[in-house]
Amino acid sequence: MIASIRGIIQSIGIDHLIVETGGVGLLIYAPRSTLNAVGQIGSETFLYTLLIVREDALTLYGFSDPAQRNLFEQLIGVSGVGPKIALNLLSSGSPDEIQKSIAGGDIARLARVPGIGKKTAERIVLELRGKIDLRQLSGTTPGNVSTLDRELTDILISLGYSATEAAAAIAALPGDAPPTLEERLRLALRYFGSA
C-alpha cells in the first residue's frame, strides 16, 4: 500500500493532480478541498494516499490529512458508494462537518451532493452513524465540551441512548440554545422525537 506521497506538482485538474516523485508522474484523484490546498504547479506537496486495486486498474487517491483518508475509506465501505461519490461527498465539506451530518442523520444535506440520492444518503447514515464518535471531532473535543453538555450526555445515556446518539443530539442543538440543562434536554429529546 502507498500511504503517502511527497513530490512536485506537475498539473492540477478538476478532480485530480499529477505529482512527480522519483522521476514518475503519479495521477492522484483528490477532493476539491485537497486540490485547493496543495499549492501551485511546480511546488512540493505531501499527500496521504490510498491505493485501490481493481481487476482492471490501480487508482491512487490523495488527501490533505488522515481524517479525510479515514472518512473516504469508511464511505467506500458503504454499499452503493464508490470512490467518485465518496470524493464528491468529501468535496462538500470538512470531514468533521460530514461526520456530524451522518451522525445527526441529516439526509437532506447528504442528498444534495452530486451522485447521492435520498436512498444512498439513508444507507450512508444507516451504515456509518454508529461508527462515528462525535467526541473525537475537532470542534467537539473533550476540552471544548461544556460541563452542561457532559451532564446532558450522562442524562441521555441514562435514558437509554448510546453515547454516539447523545453526542449527535448535542451537536444538533442550535448555537443559541438556552443555557439551562432542562431546556437543552427538551431540545435533545425533540431531536429524537421523544418530546
Curated annotation (Swiss-Prot):
Cellular component terms (Gene Ontology): cytoplasm; Holliday junction helicase complex; Holliday junction resolvase complex
Places the protein is found: Cytoplasm
Stretches for region Domain III: 151-195
Flexible linker: annotated segments: 143-151
Keywords, comma-separated and alphabetical: Cytoplasm, DNA damage, DNA recombination, DNA repair, DNA-binding
Source taxon at top rank: Bacteria
A GO MF label: four-way junction DNA binding
Region (Domain I): 1-64
Cross-referenced Pfam families: HHH_5, RuvA_C, RuvA_N
Subunit and interaction comment: Homotetramer. Forms an RuvA(8)-RuvB(12)-Holliday junction (HJ) complex. HJ DNA is sandwiched between 2 RuvA tetramers; dsDNA enters through RuvA and exits via RuvB. An RuvB hexamer assembles on each DNA strand where it exits the tetramer. Each RuvB hexamer is contacted by two RuvA subunits (via domain III) on 2 adjacent RuvB subunits; this complex drives branch migration. In the full resolvosome a probable DNA-RuvA(4)-RuvB(12)-RuvC(2) complex forms which resolves the HJ.
Protein family (similarity comment): Belongs to the RuvA family.
Function, in words: The RuvA-RuvB-RuvC complex processes Holliday junction (HJ) DNA during genetic recombination and DNA repair, while the RuvA-RuvB complex plays an important role in the rescue of blocked DNA replication forks via replication fork reversal (RFR). RuvA specifically binds to HJ cruciform DNA, conferring on it an open structure. The RuvB hexamer acts as an ATP-dependent pump, pulling dsDNA into and through the RuvAB complex. HJ branch migration allows RuvC to scan DNA until it finds its consensus sequence, where it cleaves and resolves the cruciform DNA.
Protein name, UniProt field: Holliday junction branch migration complex subunit RuvA
Native species: Chloroflexus aurantiacus (strain ATCC 29366 / DSM 635 / J-10-fl)
Gene (name only): ruvA
